[in-house]
């Protein structure tokens, strides 16, 4: 490269950087992101959508000259690559994309080290090959660079071409997916049609809009939501209303549990024999097999939030992290004010995770038994926290000392991605799909099942079982779409988008003192739990703002919204813009008569719930049946075993 003609000009370096970033992004679409790409138009959009913003950003550096212009171009390209790779790793773990809201959850990463490290793949070097080559040239082969300035009069042309390409991209996107930016809640749609870089810009704009919404909110906004939710309220079932008044309420959170495990056998052995028994209808528990999680990016925290508030989580980020200082009318506070319940949460992790130590105060939760109340010695810990069997045993001992009535929420941890378990704790062989995540899930789910059985037996021994309402539920899916190939081997069937929606069943079991069990096939979600519990306790709900309906009410609403705008009814499901029959998961070509009504209801539910959170609307509510929670009243002391970790 001794001649001037063979040197790399700044514009050539610009083109190389744009092309390699575009190719890496296209690679990620097919290797790491599950975007459901079909047809020539969508593939063309995938090739087009990274280019516009990447070229626009990097073209700014064409105004510079000399070596620093190359360095600025390199740094800009590296930052875009880093954004792409950060999304790749995040998607592998959460099946979603990074937003400005999720940056508020970065403090959780330290506590999830093992799970995060499992998200790295051997081929990840592909994302940085070009970066290393460019860095080598900039440091060791500067003589290859033509440092003459690029003609500034052509820079606006490059920028204009980038903007024009963006609008062409948007036109294709709107043709293939109408009202993309105004109606969709699903980040996968946005990334598929706009690319991860334009999505980041879009998310930034939405974040600013949401922050402004609180400042502009008024009592009129609250009135609109109240009028909407009151139209949806259902009458309680007289056979169940008040039957659990002042009974203890125990809520058991099964981490990452999905009900495809119920009655599932691996190598001839039942994966969850105890839960199978509870699901039979012959025990005192009523089992809801068509109960779905409704979480978004907040995952576990979203499930807690939805079940204790009958609100949906946020479309971006976690309500715990972003709206933890809002005013709420939560289930624990209502139970306290109406019937004198004392509430607690028990969890084998530290209290700052998911901002729990702050948000629980706004829920009116009296006590938080975090990791400092348990022996966190290395032998007792696996993956993200305390082993479930030890957690349940110690928690039952704490509960035995409580004064009735209490509302107690237990959050398990062992059945958490990446589903690792000490060999001595494994009592079933892994499945043999070849996918470490799916195969490990079988073992950790069995361990969770055994831990739950030991806990229920412990409650009986301690005299707590008969006088308690006991709820059991899965918080969110454990196996994401990234593992569909392995799931097909495990289940012996094709995992289509419709089937994956079916797999979002996480189950709900409830034991009510004085009532026999059974199987209830109503379609329901986590948003329905709060009104159910209030009615069981004999509390009139007409003045409470809730989006769910009582599971035992004859008027229970069987339309189950998902956070991305999809939904399922007792007859069909709406997934990725298509309608499928629940009977056989086949595509329905004739639109059901109630489809538009249900779709509008789902969109309105999510919109109204978002308005409540973004506007902090409960601060305006003068509810005659509720006194606003004063969070300063609550303080969560460090437990007696704070120094047990070794």
UniProtKB/Swiss-Prot annotation:
Residues 623-638 have a biased composition (Basic and acidic residues). It is a multi-pass membrane protein. Coiled coil: none annotated. The chain crosses the membrane at residues 8-28, 44-64, 69-89, 120-140, 154-174. Substrate binds at residue 416. GO terms for cellular component: extracellular region; plasma membrane. Residues 623-646 are annotated as: Disordered. Mn(2+) binds at residues 255, 300, 475-476. InterPro entries: Alkaline_phosphatase_core_sf (IPR017850), LtaS-like (IPR012160), OpgB/LTA_synthase_biosynth (IPR050448), Sulfatase_N (IPR000917). The active site is at residue 300. Pathway: Cell wall biogenesis; lipoteichoic acid biosynthesis. It comes from Staphylococcus aureus (strain MW2). It holds the Pfam family Sulfatase. Keywords: Cell membrane, Cell wall biogenesis/degradation, Manganese, Membrane, Metal-binding, Secreted, Transferase, Transmembrane, Transmembrane helix. Its EC number is 2.7.8.-. Residues 29-43, 90-119, 175-646 are extracellular. One of its GO terms (molecular function) is transferase activity. The record marks 217-218 as: Cleavage. The gene is ltaS. This is Lipoteichoic acid synthase. Catalyzes the polymerization of lipoteichoic acid (LTA) polyglycerol phosphate, a reaction that presumably uses phosphatidylglycerol (PG) as substrate. Is required for staphylococcal growth and cell division process. Residues 1-7, 65-68, 141-153 are cytoplasmic. It is found in: Cell membrane. Its main location: membrane. Proteolytically cleaved. Belongs to the LTA synthase family. One of its GO terms (biological process) is lipoteichoic acid biosynthetic process. It comes from the Bacteria.
């Amino acid at each position: 490269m001794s001649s001037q003609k063979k040197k790399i000009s700044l514009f050539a370096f610009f083109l190389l950087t744009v092309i390699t970033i575009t190719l890496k992004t296209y690679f990620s679409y097919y290797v790491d992101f599950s975007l459901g790409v079909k047809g020539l138009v969508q593939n063309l959009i995938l090739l087009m959508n990274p280019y516009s913003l990447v070229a626009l950003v990097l073209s700014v550096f064409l105004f510079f000259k000399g070596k620093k212009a190359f360095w600025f171009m390199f740094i800009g390209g590296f930052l875009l690559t880093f954004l792409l790779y950060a999304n790749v790793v995040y998607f592998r773990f959460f099946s979603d994309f990074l937003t400005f809201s999720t940056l508020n959850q970065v403090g959780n990463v330290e506590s999830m080290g093992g799970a995060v490290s499992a998200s790295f793949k051997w081929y990840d070097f592909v994302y940085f090959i070009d970066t290393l080559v460019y860095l080598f040239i900039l440091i060791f082969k500067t003589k290859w660079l033509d440092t003459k300035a690029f003609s500034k009069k052509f820079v606006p042309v490059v920028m204009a071409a980038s903007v024009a390409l963006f609008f062409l991209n948007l036109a294709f996107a709107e043709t293939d997916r109408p009202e993309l930016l105004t109606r969709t809640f699903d980040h996968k749609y946005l990334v598929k049609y706009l690319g991860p870089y334009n999505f980041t810009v879009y998310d930034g704009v939405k974040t600013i809009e949401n922050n402004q919404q609180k400042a502009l909110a008024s009592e009129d906004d609250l009135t609109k939501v109240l009028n909407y939710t009151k139209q949806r309220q259902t009458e309680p079932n007289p056979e169940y209303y008040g039957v659990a008044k002042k009974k203890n309420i125990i809520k058991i959170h099964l981490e990452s549990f999905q009900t495809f495990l119920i009655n599932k056998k691996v190598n001839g052995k039942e994966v969850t024999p105890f839960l199978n028994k509870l699901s039979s209808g012959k025990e005192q528990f009523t089992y809801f097999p068509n109960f779905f999680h409704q979480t978004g990016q907040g995952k576990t925290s979203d499930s807690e939030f939805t079940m204790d508030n009958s609100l949906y989580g946020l479309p971006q980020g976690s309500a715990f992290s972003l709206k933890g200082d809002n005013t709420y009318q939560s289930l624990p506070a209502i139970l306290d004010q109406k019937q004198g319940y004392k509430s607690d949460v028990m969890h084998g992790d530290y209290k700052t995770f998911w901002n729990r130590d702050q948000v629980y105060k706004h829920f009116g939760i009296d006590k938080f038994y975090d990791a400092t109340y348990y022996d966190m010695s290395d032998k007792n810990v696996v993956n993200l926290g305390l082993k479930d069997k030890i957690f349940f045993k110690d928690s039952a001992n704490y509960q035995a000392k409580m004064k009735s009535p209490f509302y107690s929420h237990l959050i398990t941890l062992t059945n958490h991605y990446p589903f690792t378990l000490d060999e001595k704790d494994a009592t079933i062989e892994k499945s043999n799909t070849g996918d470490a995540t799916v195969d490990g899930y079988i073992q950790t789910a069995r361990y969770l099942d055994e831990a739950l059985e030991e806990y229920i037996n412990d409650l009986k021994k301690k005299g707590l079982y008969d006088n308690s309402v006991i709820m059991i539920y899965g918080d969110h899916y454990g196996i994401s779409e990234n593992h569909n190939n392995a799931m097909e081997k495990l289940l012996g069937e094709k995992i289509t988008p419709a089937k994956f929606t079916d797999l979002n069943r996480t189950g709900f079991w409830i034991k009510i003192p004085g009532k026999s069990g059974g199987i209830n096939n109503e379609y329901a979600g986590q948003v329905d739990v709060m009104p159910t519990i209030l009615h069981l306790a004999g509390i009139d709900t007409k003045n409470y703002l809730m989006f769910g309906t009582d599971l035992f009410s004859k008027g229970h609403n069987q339309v189950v919204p998902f956070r991305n705008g999809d939904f399922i009814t007792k007859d069909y499901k709406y997934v990725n813009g298509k309608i499928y029959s629940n009977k056989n998961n086949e595509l329905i070509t004739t639109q059901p008569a109630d489809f538009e009504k249900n779709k509008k209801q789902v969109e309105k539910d999510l919109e109204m719930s978002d308005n409540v959170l973004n506007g902090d609307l409960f601060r305006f509510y003068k509810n005659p049946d509720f006194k606003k929670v004063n969070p300063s009243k609550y303080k969560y002391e460090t437990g007696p075993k704070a120094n047990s970790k070794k």
